[in-house]
């Protein structure tokens, strides 16, 4: 490999690094490459700080093959891209380039990715980060409905017929981006918060950020009865992928299963709008499998310049291991949240999170 005008070139790959810069063309290229919310500029702008954000781009010919946005501070390169799959050769190339370019960098951190690290060039730590359930969408809503299990399909049809029979004014409407009414989102978040908090821990959504992101790439489904919002969901679209974010339903209409109907109607609408994938998010909820979601697990990855640097950062390495076990414990607790001991631990955890959030805001 040779260096030419600040870029590294091989026979097929050219690598460029834009320090404290995110070129405009990267927004569409990120969508083309990863097609995921958590590696998109709208998400970074709302949920991450874009100050002093730099860009790594590997080119094959005139087309990028890898784009990773990162921050470098205190000897650590923090990659913002999440929930993506990276080929090991690409990841190895990135690590070698970054350690060569930033001589004081000791660690490269990924929050959530899928990759093979067999015979990797550098010492690594790899532990469970999170998961998500993904539905591969067929060409039509009819095909999707037919693919559902018989009991799920029958249940949806029964609940839909029942709510229409009992409430002829029942309607489902979709709004995108600037069409979205902020009040609709607030009401959906409130309904969602009430349901989550009913499990005995105080919970609140980040309303401002959700509204801001929805205005940029949102798809909001609102269910009305007699002109009143009775259920709904906030979703996002990046490229050909849709992402379910928040779902809320009024307790008064619980017998109609409006939560399940909201999700089903949103998935069907995503298909109509040429969606290829629908992300149901993480968490061990049975309905996600029944709606044809397939679990995709992601790992946290820490890459060290050397074993010596790993030992010098032993405190961080230990924290990474502990965090991985805590995440796995959190998944187990949610699977068994009806048990008294698990419920107590979950309540304590969410109480601590809310106290930390208030402390950060004050």
Predicted regions located by residue number:
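A conserved beta-strand-loop-helix scaffold within acyl/acetyltransferase catalytic domains
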Residues: 2-76, 113-132, 146-255, 356-362
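N-terminal accessory interaction module
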Residues: 60-63, 69, 76-109
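A generic secondary-structure signal
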Residues: 97-101, 158, 162, 269
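Short, high-confidence coil segments that cap the C-terminus of an alpha-helix
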Residues: 53, 103-107, 218, 272-275
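Active-site/acyl-donor-binding loops of N-acyltransferases
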Residues: 2-10, 119-147, 276-346, 350-362
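Non-catalytic accessory segments adjacent to catalytic cores
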Residues: 90-136
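Aromatic (often tryptophan-rich) hydrophobic motifs at membrane interfaces
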Residues: 95-96, 201-313
């Amino acid at each position: 490999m040779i260096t030419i005008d600040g870029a590294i070139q091989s026979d097929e790959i050219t690598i460029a690094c834009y320090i404290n810069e995110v070129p405009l063309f990267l927004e569409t290229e990120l969508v083309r490459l990863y097609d995921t919310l958590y590696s998109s500029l709208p998400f970074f702008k709302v949920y991450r700080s874009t100050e002093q954000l730099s860009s790594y781009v590997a080119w094959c010919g005139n087309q990028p093959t890898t784009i990773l946005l990162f921050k470098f501070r205190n000897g650590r390169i923090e990659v913002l891209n999440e929930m993506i799959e990276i080929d090991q050769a690409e990841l190895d190339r990135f690590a070698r380039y970054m350690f060569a370019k930033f001589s004081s960098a000791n660690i490269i951190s990924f929050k959530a990715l899928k990759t093979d690290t067999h015979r990797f060039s550098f010492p690594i730590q790899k532990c469970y980060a999170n998961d998500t359930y993904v539905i591969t969408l067929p060409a039509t809503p009819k095909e999707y409905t037919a693919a559902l299990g018989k009991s799920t399909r029958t249940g949806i049809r029964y609940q839909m017929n029942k709510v229409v029979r009992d409430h002829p004014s029942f309607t489902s409407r979709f709004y995108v981006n600037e069409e979205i009414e902020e009040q609709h989102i607030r009401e959906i978040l409130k309904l969602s918060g009430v349901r989550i908090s009913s499990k005995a821990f105080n919970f609140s959504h980040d309303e401002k950020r959700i509204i801001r992101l929805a205005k940029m790439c949102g798809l909001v489904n609102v269910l009305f009865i007699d002109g009143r919002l009775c259920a709904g969901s906030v979703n996002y679209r990046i490229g050909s992928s849709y992402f379910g974010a928040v779902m809320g339903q009024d307790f008064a209409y619980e017998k109609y299963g409006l939560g399940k109907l909201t999700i089903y109607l949103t998935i069907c609408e995503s298909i109509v709008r040429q969606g290829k994938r629908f992300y149901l998010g993480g968490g061990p909820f049975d309905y996600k499998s029944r709606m044809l979601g397939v679990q995709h697990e992601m790992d946290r990855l820490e890459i060290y310049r050397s074993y010596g640097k790993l030992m010098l950062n032993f405190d961080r390495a230990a924290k990474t291991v502990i965090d991985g076990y805590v995440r796995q414990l959190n998944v187990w607790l949610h699977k068994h949240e009806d048990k008294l001991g698990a419920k107590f631990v979950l309540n304590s955890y969410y109480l601590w999170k809310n106290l930390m959030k208030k402390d950060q805001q004050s």
